[in-house]
């Protein structure tokens, strides 16, 4: 049943072409916009407070990525969340580097507190730090395993009423109903900058058409990452093939290759 829901979500994104508002970091804007276009969604990188109320009145979801955070961006992010709340839209939070500095940790928690409808997507160390536990990280890179973050994820689900996506060698999608384990992806994927940020952006696209868990996006990126890696000679060509496979992916391939387990 879950696999059928995931494949139907892929078709729905392509049919509905949802608009996804992104407040994201300078490093990955091009990557994430291209990924959203390739899957069939419509991205807009809107950072201005002056237009945010209007944008959120017709957008499908809001993605907030704190990767290049500063004092100018923080109030814009909070205001954007308020506008998403006013319009009943879901917020997808990527707490990049949470735990690496107090600014990142406090900002991530403030956004999580503000959002009425929330998906949190992070690596294990970010999820652990966001929950207030001691994490092992090196800047924005995780040193903790995905399994180690499961307890923290369950805490965040209860604390913020959120769904939590832990990405890593194994992906976990944790909701109040269940925990789903995904074992797709490829070991080359962490060598392309912004791969997690790409997942966060895709999560926004699928949230806009009704998947408020983050499962469909994680399933899709894991499968296309595997297929792309089979053709790639290294990280550079992996990035190119990843976009191609996001564009080419069909329901049958997704269902056949998906490695999913409900825990």
From Swiss-Prot:
Keyword Metal-binding: yes
Pathway: Cofactor biosynthesis; thiamine diphosphate biosynthesis; 4-methyl-5-(2-phosphoethyl)-thiazole from 5-(2-hydroxyethyl)-4-methylthiazole: step 1/1
EC number: 2.7.1.50
EC supergroup of this enzyme: transferase
CDD domains in alphabetical order: THZ_kinase
Binding site for substrate: 45, 194
Keyword tags: ATP-binding, Kinase, Magnesium, Metal-binding, Nucleotide-binding, Thiamine biosynthesis, Transferase
Family: Belongs to the Thz kinase family.
HAMAP family, A to Z: Thz_kinase
Name the UniProt record assigns to this protein: Hydroxyethylthiazole kinase
Biological source species: Vibrio parahaemolyticus serotype O3:K6 (strain RIMD 2210633)
Encoding gene per record: thiM
């Amino acid at each position: 049943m879950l696999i059928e829901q995931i494949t139907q979500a892929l078709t729905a994104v392509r049919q509905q072409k949802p608009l996804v508002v992104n407040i994201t970091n300078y490093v990955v804007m091009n990557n994430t916009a291209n990924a959203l276009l390739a899957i069939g969604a419509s991205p807009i990188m809107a950072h201005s407070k002056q237009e945010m109320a209007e944008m959120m009145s017709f957008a499908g979801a809001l993605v907030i990525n704190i990767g290049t955070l500063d004092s100018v961006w923080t109030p814009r992010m909070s205001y954007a969340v308020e506008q998403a709340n006013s319009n009943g839209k879901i917020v997808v939070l990527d707490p990049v580097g949470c735990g690496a500095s107090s600014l990142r940790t406090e900002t991530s928690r403030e956004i999580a507190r503000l959002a009425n409808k929330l998906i949190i997507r992070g690596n294990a160390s970010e999820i652990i730090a966001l929950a207030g536990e001691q994490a092992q990280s090196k800047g924005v890179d995780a040193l903790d395993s995905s399994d180690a973050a499961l307890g923290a994820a369950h805490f965040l689900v209860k604390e913020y009423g959120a769904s939590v996506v832990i990405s890593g060698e194994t992906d976990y999608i944790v909701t109040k109903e269940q925990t789903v384990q995904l074992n797709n992806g490829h070991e080359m994927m962490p060598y392309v900058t912004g791969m997690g940020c790409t997942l966060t952006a895709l999560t926004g696209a699928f949230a806009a058409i009704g998947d408020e868990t983050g499962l469909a996006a994680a399933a899709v990126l894991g499968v296309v990452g595997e297929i792309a890696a089979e053709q790639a000679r290294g990280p550079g060509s992996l990035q190119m093939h990843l976009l191609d496979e996001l564009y080419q992916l069909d329901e049958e391939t997704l269902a056949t290759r998906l490695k999913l387990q409900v825990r």
